């Protein structure tokens, strides 16, 4: 009997091993720490208290039943620390006899690899198990002790983690860096010249930038009637070297850049390719290729491209904490240039195939040419550059970087030209640009940064980002429009200087990780109160200690002990100190003299106008942050309510509350669909929204259901309400029942639960 992690591997492995073997799947871990308690005996060496979750009990029962009948049990979980721990948990939980139990590992699902693994079994490596156990215990201690601090000081249901909180800090710090950035205008000068000998066009850029329109205009004025001459030509040959085969992080980065895959999509598709036996194991720090893969690649390249394109290379893994002796991610068979499968599988496989083959190809040789152009009336020089490919080498099949892409896309043949040749200026343009702020992190660039800082490991990158974006709502993946500036461009043609007004956009980005207000608040609090946890070096040093545990150099519980006691003391101090002041920022004073304040409450960020006696509220618009909100933007949020007219004799009013924009139609409140601008919506659009809401509530007494019926949103005689645990909860005014999520329902229930139970039929939720 062979036990693997994923059922997707069963068919292939059974096919390779034959009738004497039965393959079963554990479907990941079969036991873990309990969800609702610390589950760690701190007083006795941090001993974990493992349990079999309810959804794994049948799997454990079936595995034990099969194992008892088997002559030999082969534990074939994945070849990493998590996989080693899974094998150990199987051994312990199933009560396997060590005499008839073998541990086998393979890095690809091929007949050769499987048979070699069976022929070379080993014992479970307890150093690897201890390293995984140390990480699990450490992460549980951090999360279990820090999260309640956030619940008390900021808001319920928040979480913190050893890796996730540091990743959050990276994104938040980058956002603050961008907010502090002040765009500065400058002028770049572009010359469009004509050669004397061949009358060919030649574009060149002035090597100096000008700070103002006046300086740029003065330069163009001096160019009137000026002579331009080629003062120098420099040619320099250089080589481009192919990138190493993929590791987990470089695959995630390249798939994001070239295929626009999210990190989680890349890992899901790679898992499928691995289970189908098409690629090697997809969680690896290694850039090594096996001798068999090197030989196969050399043969393929020589036969298909020629011997001059082949160059065998063995790359050294750069990461200091690279884990077990995996290979890089590569096709199991280089000859398989294409595969069947989904479009995503085909695209990712093609990317992996090209990267692997390119890594074993010759360098590309290019010629870089720079032409210098002098003006007799000014000391500044123009410069024109061109790139010519002399030998394409690995570029024949694969481009890794933007530099490589630029070589092929911008390969330029300069006109025949010589030093001393005079040029005529067809036009000289002064283009106003702005300095650009730092780029925000994309999923892929965040993974790259985490890897550079040695934070996390291949198996943690994807779940960390998923936790921050999907489960916690600290980050959102989205676009930024950027700031728009009106600029004046100048153009010299002949002796005439003309001007034109254009719009220059600064800081526009697509598909980047954007911090939400709650993410900024949590990051700032943790950085101020738990600087050790949020320190990049601390998190990286933990990874190094885990590597030492895996190598048998450190005892795992000693590592935990040295961290835990100082950390626990700080947690206790934070719990007992004064109430954390929830975020509140004065924005300014409205024209009517009322103070405008931005705050963060139970239902998110909002602005408040006026004193407690007659205050007004408005939620922040999508993309707005408390930290960067201006007075002008805040005042626009109070332009609501808008009366759009009547439908069926009832007023239709667009307004906004703590819970977002909604329609007030008669005595009904209907939430606006996500993405609808309350300042631009028309009466006709409202008609459709109202009609849909009426149809849904009229035909469906059950509006929504969550957690297998534990939470229900229902229509009653007095309107929609929430039912949970035998109790009914009123839905706060301004909240549309149709748009409620499980999280929002839970917040309403929690809010009502904090009040003293009333004798009435309903518990009233806090407004």
Locate each region found by the language model.
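Intrinsically disordered, low-complexity regulatory segments
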Residues: 1-136, 142-145, 306, 402
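Basic, low-complexity terminal or inter-domain segments flanking catalytic cores
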Residues: 12, 147, 180, 263-264, ...
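Short active-site loop/helix that positions an aromatic residue
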Residues: 12-16, 88-89, 168-178, 354
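Glycine- and acidic
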Residues: 70-74, 152-154, 231-238, 249-257, ...
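C-terminal or mid-to-C-terminal helical accessory/interaction module adjacent to the motor/catalytic core
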Residues: 109-191, 235-239
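Metal- or metallocofactor-binding catalytic centers and their adjacent structured scaffolds
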Residues: 210-245, 252, 418-422, 431, ...
């Amino acid at each position: 009997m062979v036990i693997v992690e994923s059922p997707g591997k069963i068919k292939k492995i059974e096919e390779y091993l034959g009738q004497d073997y039965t393959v079963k799947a554990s479907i990941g871990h079969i036991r873990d720490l309990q969800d609702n308690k610390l589950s760690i005996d701190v007083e006795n060496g941090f001993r974990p208290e493992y349990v079999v979750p309810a959804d794994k009990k049948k799997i454990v029962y079936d595995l034990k039943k099969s194992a008892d009948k088997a002559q030999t049990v082969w534990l074939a979980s994945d070849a990493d620390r998590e996989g080693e721990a899974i094998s150990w948990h199987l051994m312990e939980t199933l009560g396997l006899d060590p005499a008839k139990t073998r541990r086998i590992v393979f890095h690809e699902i091929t007949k050769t690899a499987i048979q070699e693994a069976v022929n070379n079994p080993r014992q479970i490596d307890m150093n690897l198990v201890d390293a995984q156990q140390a990480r699990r215990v450490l992460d549980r201690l951090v999360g279990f002790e820090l999260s309640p601090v956030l619940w008390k000081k900021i808001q319920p249901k928040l979480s913190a983690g050893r890796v996730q909180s540091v990743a959050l800090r990276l994104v938040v710090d980058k956002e603050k860096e961008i907010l502090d950035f002040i765009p500065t205008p400058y002028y770049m000068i572009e010359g469009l010249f004509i050669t004397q000998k061949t009358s060919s066009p030649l574009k060149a850029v002035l090597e100096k930038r000008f700070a103002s329109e006046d300086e740029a205009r003065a330069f163009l004025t001096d160019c009137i009637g000026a002579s331009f001459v080629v003062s120098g030509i420099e040619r320099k040959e250089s080589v481009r070297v192919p990138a190493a085969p993929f590791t987990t992080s470089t695959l995630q980065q390249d798939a994001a850049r070239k295929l626009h895959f999210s990190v989680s999509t890349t890992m899901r598709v790679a898992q499928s390719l691995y289970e189908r036996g098409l690629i090697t194991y997809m969680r690896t720090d290694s850039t090594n290729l096996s001798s068999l893969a090197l030989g196969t690649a050399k043969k393929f390249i020589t036969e298909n491209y020629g011997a001059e394109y082949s160059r065998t290379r063995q790359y050294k893994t750069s990461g200091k904490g690279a884990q077990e002796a995996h290979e890089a991610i590569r096709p199991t068979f280089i000859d398989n240039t294409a595969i069947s499968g989904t479009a995503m599988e085909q695209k990712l496989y093609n990317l992996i195939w090209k990267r692997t083959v390119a890594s074993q190809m010759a360098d590309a040789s290019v010629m870089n040419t720079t032409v210098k152009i002098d003006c007799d009336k000014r000391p500044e020089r123009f410069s024109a550059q061109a790139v010519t490919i002399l030998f394409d080498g690995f570029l024949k099949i694969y481009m890794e970087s933007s530099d490589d892409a630029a070589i092929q896309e911008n390969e330029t043949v300069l006109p025949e030209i010589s030093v001393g040749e005079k040029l005529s200026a067809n036009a000289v343009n002064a283009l106003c640009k702005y300095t650009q702020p730092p780029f925000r992190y994309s999923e892929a660039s965040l993974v790259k940064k985490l890897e550079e800082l040695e934070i996390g490991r291949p198996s943690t990158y994807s779940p960390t980002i998923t936790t921050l974006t999907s489960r916690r709502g600290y980050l959102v993946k989205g676009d930024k429009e950027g700031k728009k500036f009106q600029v004046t461009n100048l153009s010299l043609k002949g002796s005439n200087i003309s001007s034109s007004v254009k719009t220059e956009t600064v800081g526009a980005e697509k598909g980047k990780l954007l911090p939400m207000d709650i993410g900024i608040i949590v990051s700032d609090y943790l950085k101020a109160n738990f600087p050790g946890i949020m320190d990049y070096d601390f998190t990286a040093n933990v990874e190094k200690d885990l590597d030492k545990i895996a190598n048998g150099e450190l005892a795992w519980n000693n590592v935990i002990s040295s961290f835990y006691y100082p950390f626990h003391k700080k947690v206790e101090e934070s719990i007992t100190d004064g109430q954390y002041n929830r975020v509140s920022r004065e924005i300014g004073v409205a024209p009517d003299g009322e103070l405008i304040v931005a705050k963060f409450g139970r239902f998110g960020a909002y602005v408040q106008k006026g004193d407690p006696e007659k205050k007004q509220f408005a939620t922040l618009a999508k993309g707005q942050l408390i930290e960067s909100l201006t007075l002008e933007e805040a005042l626009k949020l109070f332009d609501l309510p808008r009366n759009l007219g009547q439908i069926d004799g009832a007023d239709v009013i667009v307004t906004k509350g703590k819970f977002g924009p909604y329609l007030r139609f008669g005595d009904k409140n209907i939430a606006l669909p996500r993405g609808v601008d309350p300042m631009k919506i028309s009466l006709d659009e409202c008609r459709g929204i109202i009609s849909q809401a009426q149809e849904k509530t009229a035909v469906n007494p059950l509006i929504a259901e969550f957690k297998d019926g534990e939470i229900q949103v229902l229509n009653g005689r007095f309107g929609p309400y929430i039912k949970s645990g035998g109790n009914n909860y009123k839905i706060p005014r301004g909240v549309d029942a149709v748009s409620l999520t499980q999280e929002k329902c839970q917040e309403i229930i929690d809010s009502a639960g904090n009040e003293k139970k009333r004798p009435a039929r309903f518990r009233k939720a806090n407004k």
